[in-house]
């Protein structure tokens, strides 16, 4: 057994010859950006694959978050989770809004609907939950609260590509959902992202906002930005869409092996599949109980690293611990006990389509032995 580096993720790459052939067509057309044919085709193909009405492509996964808040004219306070990647909360801050942190449900890692109402004030205008690790939020519980108080709901669905609940896309929940197509994700366009909306009017507004606010050659209808996806990455995305199902199934098989081996290891827990959910196996987080396992999370993380097996403490530290946000009242430790416990115990194991049986076994040997 060799000692090659096992990475926590690996990008899904289209066949290079196939991609080169598409690049040749783009070169010949000389249309490399600005809503070209590949861009249009990818939006249509993604809407069909994801079972959603409208898709708007972006150049990365952060800009859809920023633009969604603009599109819905969100002001004041936005309720969100501290247990996420920093882009979630940064998008709120960049829009001049105040993030209000609410604790998570330890059973899922997602925003706990039972704790949302207590955080609502007269300045609250929206809720921004995250489908953490691609595990669906309690969308009904969240929507019931949003409807009661007249709040908008924007889902950060960066991890939730292709996830369904009882045959329905999780991306259809809320007012808007956003996706990341970063190289680390299940489906990628190198860098990229998308926004999912439910009606043509919102789709049109989003498309204006991501193109400087232009509604025509000489008409600007609002203060937009430039966040369009180019033709090269659109072509790359179309090719990757053809192989993403096989990649997800390969991840599924890795998850099965991890669960079989780790289920009897005292002090190590993990999430099982949720009933009725079509998962995408974006990540495989484990949680270390130091007292039962006999080793802290950080000690296990270091042991793995020494063996050339890279895990990721994802999400540690909490967003609420960063200097920009730690002074917020809602960032207080006593307000977020479940989130702190999860952040202090998590390691995401290597999880991607290219892991071999030997890679999986080396990873497990670090933990089981």
What is each of the regions a protein language model found here?
Residues 1-32, 350:
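N-terminal "arm"/small-domain region of PLP-dependent enzymes with the aminotransferase-like
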Residues 31, 35-77, 83, 91-94, ...:
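Phosphate-binding glycine-rich loop
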Residues 37-45, 49-55, 114, 118, ...:
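PLP-dependent aminotransferase class I/II
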Residues 70-157, 164:
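PLP-dependent aminotransferase-like
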Residues 56, 79, 100, 153-154, ...:
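Structural detector of well-ordered beta-strand residues that form the stable sheet scaffold
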Residues 155-189, 216-221:
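Conserved active-site segment immediately N-terminal to the catalytic lysine
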Residues 172-208, 231-234:
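Active-site PLP attachment segment
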């Amino acid at each position: 057994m060799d000692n090659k580096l096992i990475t926590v993720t690996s990008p899904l790459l289209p066949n290079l010859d196939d991609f080169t052939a598409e690049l040749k067509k783009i070169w010949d057309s000389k249309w490399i950006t600005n809503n070209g044919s590949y861009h249009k085709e990818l939006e249509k193909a993604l809407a069909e694959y994801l079972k959603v009405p409208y898709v708007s492509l972006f150049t990365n996964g952060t800009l859809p978050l920023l633009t969604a808040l603009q599109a819905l004219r969100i002001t004041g306070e936005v309720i969100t989770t501290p247990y996420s990647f920093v882009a979630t909360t940064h998008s709120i801050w960049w829009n001049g809004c105040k993030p209000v942190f609410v604790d998570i449900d330890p059973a899922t890692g997602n925003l706990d609907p039972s704790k949302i109402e207590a955080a609502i004030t007269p300045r609250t205008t929206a809720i921004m939950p995250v489908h953490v690790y691609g595990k669906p939020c309690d969308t009904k519980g969240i929507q019931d609260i949003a409807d009661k108080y007249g709040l908008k709901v924007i889902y950060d669905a960066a991890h939730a590509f292709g996830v369904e609940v009882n045959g329905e896309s999780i991306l259809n929940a809320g007012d808007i959902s956003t996706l990341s197509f970063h190289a680390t994700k299940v489906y990628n366009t190198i860098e990229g992202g998308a926004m999912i909306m439910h009606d043509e009017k919102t789709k049109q507004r989003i498309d204006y906002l991501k193109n400087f606010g232009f509604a025509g050659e000489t008409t600007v209808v609002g203060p937009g930005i430039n966040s369009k996806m180019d033709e090269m990455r659109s072509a790359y995305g179309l090719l990757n869409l053809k192989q993403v199902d096989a990649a997800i199934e390969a991840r599924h098989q890795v998850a099965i092996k991890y669960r079989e081996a780790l289920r009897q290891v005292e002090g190590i827990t993990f999430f099982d599949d949720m009933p009725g959910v079509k998962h995408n196996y974006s990540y495989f987080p484990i949680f270390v109980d130091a007292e039962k396992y006999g080793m802290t999370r950080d000690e296990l993380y270091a042991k793995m690293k020494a063996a050339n097996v890279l895990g990721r403490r994802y999400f540690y530290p909490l967003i609420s611990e960063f200097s920009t946000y730690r002074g917020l009242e809602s960032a207080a430790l006593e307000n977020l006990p479940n989130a702190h416990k999860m952040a202090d115990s998590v390691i995401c194991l290597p999880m991607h389509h290219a892991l071999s049986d030997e890679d999986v076994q080396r990873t497990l040997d670090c933990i089981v032995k």
